[in-house]
């Protein structure tokens, strides 16, 4: 048996193999060590021939659904090796084979999957001019592809969040250099990533002559990535994939660009703080799992075309105006369940009887939804109603054939209703009413023969028999066959008893076989309805998301935004949707107005103290814009949203030590990406840019960036720039579309009160020492900091740092160069020259120490 294990293990050496042995799944050798650590099961040993032993750990086969998810969540690939024949029917070693390879990206196990998230498998192909990427969720059948530059593919990988990514063997450095090392990855041979192999695989699966019908024919690299995914499914024994019915192109031009920094810093999907809340947490009131998954997708793919946005908003508003309609949809949605994943299980042959019944319930619930949508005074709802398919024939067949409360597994019996199959009904009568049937035979034969003491009995030697006492044996019919003679009686068998014996002894086994066949036939019939039911699931998910928007809007007092095809962003009394939900009871969120356009107020420079609310204001502006463009109402009194095509944020950076990047370097990388991709319809948010370096460097960079955005010949991007560099307030004097604002505070008795109101004009104080005091800083440090601050402010006033030089810079912008100070100290110049003249490559450690000592003497000489 161990040789059998080793032979199978050699096919998937990187996977943990669960080896079926009787009623257990066992793991051996290094797999056993890994399994015992992850699963918390006992590690033991078993004999391995010639006095040797091998590590072993196992668990009961019925606990597979408990232990398998733990291995997958730990990032392991799991090969399930089952017995392929009944051990009772063979005297040799039981034949075994790998029936499934479960990986983080390929699973349909409910205990592995998160019902609110897609479980995407991705593949990346590195082409010559661009990069191809594909995404597949085998649990829903969604199959998507795209291609473009590395930054676009990086954005897609972060937005879709695949659980596993495939790429060509030997290209790990290229992959991690462009996309990082946070993903679970698997390398495939180079032949998988060839266009001919990929096209052949795709055309064979979709049974088409080309891929033009999917709109992906021109995406060579995307096609290669898509083909690699299908090849991987074959390798992992996932060949029943009839629910993968199309390959869709991710249309970049339809959606607002959100890079991974923006998604993270705006906390769209998850909070950056433990226990914190995200925008998704606030607006997710979806009822169905499909709706929850779609809403998450909408969050990172806002629309940028006016019509589809207004189509969504129209439905949300209709829910508002028609409470009866809303209540009906809400009630039916609770009955539908995870229609999308159930129909996928039908395709792969893993659907349970209870899930089939749930499918019937869902199709029944869709009927009133369809009717209500068709009757609604709303074009978008009418279109949804038209696309919903009741699948009446299969729905009624399920109702007719499957019990309303069947067991979870088909092998438990009791799945098929009475009256569906005559043979099954007869077998059940025999199995469930055996004694009654025997009594009927006994009574009938007694009456027909006139033998009152006749009885029917059973033994293991010749089965069922009729026993007749000797005094009545002359009354026995000729067709009875004598089987045994006793002292006082004779035992006979009849043809009827032999037939009955065969039936009753094998009835239960036959019932299971027949029920399984009838159930399999029904599931096979269901496969013909996969495309229609997938459309139903998509439309129900869409309806669920829009209903969620309506419920959130009513609960939180949101209003419908006005979507306009211009560059005006005008938000009146806007609120941060997440922060306002986290305030203590009784505390009201301070709302603010923000107006940006390309004509008079393109850039707002926001100053103010720490903790005053500058960052919240920036984020709320972006979140309100994003909510509007996914079709949601927004937290404001009014909002006119001039369509945005890109949202950029540079809000809060951290260092990336793994690739040798400091906080400031990360900040500059993000800023460079923004400036290189900005457009006239972009919304740009900068928060405290330049604080990771010296004051003068920071001011210089911040000034130059603001100036660049203002003076850009084509892209007049709407920009909010929060800063502590009060010197930037000088820019308003020389740049007509830059306006100064501050988040106001009130100072009373040497204490700061945060008013959190955005007001016109710049601020001159940061009140950082006040914040330090509030944080519990020792009093001696606070006192000393105040003393130093006063001295520095006095020195700066004397040297004119905040006066004349900045005014001169704002008036003289030649070459966008800022000169705040000169290196004119002769001692420092001498040190600089000494360092510049060093040949570092040929300097020994001793020479370096001597040179450092020389420089030290120069400084002391000063």
UniProtKB/Swiss-Prot annotation:
Record key words, sorted: ATP-binding, DNA damage, DNA repair, DNA-binding, Nucleotide-binding
Task: Write down the superkingdom of origin.
Answer: Bacteria
List the GO biological process terms.
mismatch repair
Any GO CC annotation of this UniProt entry: cytosol
Residues involved in ATP binding: 608-615
Task: Provide the gene name from the record.
Answer: mutS
| GO MF terms held by the record | ATP binding; ATP-dependent DNA damage sensor activity; damaged DNA binding; mismatched DNA binding
Statement: the UniProt record of this protein carries the keyword DNA-binding? yes
List the InterPro entries.
DNA_mismatch_repair_MutS (IPR005748), DNA_mismatch_repair_MutS-lik_N (IPR007695), DNA_mismatch_repair_MutS/MSH (IPR017261), DNA_mismatch_repair_MutS_C (IPR000432), DNA_mismatch_repair_MutS_clamp (IPR007861), DNA_mismatch_repair_MutS_core (IPR007696), DNA_mismatch_repair_MutS_N (IPR016151), DNA_mismatch_repair_MutS_sf (IPR036187)
As for family, the record states: Belongs to the DNA mismatch repair MutS family.
Q: Name one Pfam family in it.
A: MutS_V
| Keyword DNA repair found | yes
Q: What does this protein do?
A: This protein is involved in the repair of mismatches in DNA. It is possible that it carries out the mismatch recognition step. This protein has a weak ATPase activity.
In terms of HAMAP family, this protein maps to: MutS
Output this protein's name: DNA mismatch repair protein MutS
Coiled-coil annotation: which residues?
none
């Amino acid at each position: 048996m161990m040789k059998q294990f080793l032979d199978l293990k050699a096919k998937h050496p990187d996977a943990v193999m669960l080896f079926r042995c009787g009623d257990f799944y066992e793991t051996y050798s290094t797999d056993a060590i890994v399994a015992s650590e992850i699963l918390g099961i006992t590690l033991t040993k078993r004999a391995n021939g010639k006095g040797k032993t091998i590590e072993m750990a196992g668990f009961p086969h019925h606990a597979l659904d408990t232990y398998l998810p733990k291995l997958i969540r730990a990032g392991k690939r799991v090969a399930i090796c089952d017995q392929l024949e009944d051990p009772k029917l063979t005297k040799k070693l039981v034949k075994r084979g790998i029936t499934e390879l479960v990986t983080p990206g390929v699973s349909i196990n409910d205990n592995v999957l998160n019902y609110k998230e897609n479980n995407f498998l991705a593949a990346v192909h590195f082409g010559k001019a661009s990069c191809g990427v594909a995404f597949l969720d085998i649990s829903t059948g969604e199959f998507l592809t795209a291609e473009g530059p590395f930054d676009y593919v990086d954005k897609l990988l972060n937005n879709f969040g695949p659980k596993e990514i495939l790429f060509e063997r030997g290209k790990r450095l290229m992959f991690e250099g462009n996309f990082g090392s946070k993903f679970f990855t698997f390398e495939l041979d180079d032949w998988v990533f060839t266009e001919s192999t990929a096209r052949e695989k795709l055309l064979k699966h979709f049974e088409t002559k080309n891929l033009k019908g999917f709109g992906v024919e021109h995406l060579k690299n995307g096609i290669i990535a898509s083909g690699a995914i299908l090849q991987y499914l074959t390798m992992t024994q996932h060949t029943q994939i009839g629910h993968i019915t199309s390959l869709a192109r991710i249309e970049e031009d339809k959606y607002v660009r959100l890079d991974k920094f923006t998604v993270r810093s705006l906390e769209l999907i998850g909070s950056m703080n433990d226990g914190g809340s995200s925008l998704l947490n606030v607006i997710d009131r979806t009822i169905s799992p499909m709706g929850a998954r779609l809403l998450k997708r909408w969050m990172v793919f806002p629309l940028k075309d006016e019509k589809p946005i207004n189509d969504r908003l129209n439905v949300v508003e209709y829910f508002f105006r028609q409470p009866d309609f809303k209540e009906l949809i809400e009630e039916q949605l609770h009955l539908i369940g995870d229609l999308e994943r159930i129909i996928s299980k039908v395709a792969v042959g893993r659907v349970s009887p209870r899930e089939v019944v749930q499918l019937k319930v869902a199709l029944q619930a869709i009927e009133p939804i369809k009717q209500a949508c068709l009757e609604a005074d709303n074009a978008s709802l009418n279109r949804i109603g038209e696309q919903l398919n009741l699948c009446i024939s299969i729905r009624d067949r399920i109702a007719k054939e499957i019990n309303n409360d069947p067991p979870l597994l088909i092998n438990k019996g009791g799945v098929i209703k009475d009256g569906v199959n005559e043979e099954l009904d007869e077998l059940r009568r025999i199995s469930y009413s055996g004694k009654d049937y025997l009594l009927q035979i006994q009574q009938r034969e007694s009456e027909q023969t006139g033998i009152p003491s006749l009885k029917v009995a059973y033994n293991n030697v010749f089965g069922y028999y009729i026993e007749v006492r000797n005094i009545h044996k002359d009354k026995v019919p000729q067709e009875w066959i004598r089987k045994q003679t006793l002292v006082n009686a004779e035992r006979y068998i009849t043809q009827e008893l032999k037939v009955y014996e065969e039936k009753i002894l094998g009835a239960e086994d036959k019932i299971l076989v027949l029920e399984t066949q009838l159930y399999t036939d029904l599931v096979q019939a269901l496969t013909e309805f996969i495309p229609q039911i997938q459309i139903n699931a998509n439309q129900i998910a869409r309806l669920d998301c829009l209903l969620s928007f309506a419920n959130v809007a009513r609960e939180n007092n949101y209003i419908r935004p006005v979507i306009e095809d211009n560059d005006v962003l005008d938000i009146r009394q806007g609120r941060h949707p997440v922060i306002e939900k986290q305030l203590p009871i009784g505390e009201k969120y301070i709302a603010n107005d923000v107006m940006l356009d390309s004509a008079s107020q393109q850039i707002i420079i926001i100053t103010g103290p720490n903790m005053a609310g500058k960052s919240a204001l920036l984020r709320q502006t972006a979140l309100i814009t994003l909510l509007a463009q996914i079709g949601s109402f927004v937290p404001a009194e009014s909002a006119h949203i001039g369509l945005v095509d890109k949202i950029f944020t540079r809000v809060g950076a951290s260092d990336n030590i793994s690739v040798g990047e400091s906080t400031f370097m990360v900040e500059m990388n993000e800023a460079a990406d923004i400036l290189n991709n900005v457009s006239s319809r972009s919304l740009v948010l900068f928060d405290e840019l330049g604080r990771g370096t010296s004051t003068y460097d920071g001011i210089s960079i911040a000034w130059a960036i603001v100036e660049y955005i203002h003076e850009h010949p084509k892209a007049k991007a709407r920009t909010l720039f929060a800063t502590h560099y009060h010197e930037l307030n000088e820019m308003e004097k020389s740049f007509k579309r830059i306006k100064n604002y501050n988040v106001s505070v009130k100072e009373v008795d040497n204490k700061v009160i945060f008013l959190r109101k955005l007001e016109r004009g710049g601020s001159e104080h940061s009140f950082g020492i006040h914040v330090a005091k509030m944080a519990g800083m020792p009093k001696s440090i606070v006192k000393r900091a105040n003393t130093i601050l006063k001295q520095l402010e006095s020195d700066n006033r004397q040297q004119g740092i905040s006066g004349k030089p900045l005014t001169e810079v704002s008036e003289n912008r030649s070459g966008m160069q800022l000169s705040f100070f000169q290196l004119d100290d002769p001692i420092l110049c001498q040190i600089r020259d000494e360092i510049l003249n060093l040949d570092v490559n040929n300097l020994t450690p001793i020479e370096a120490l001597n040179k450092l000592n020389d420089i030290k003497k120069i400084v002391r000489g000063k």
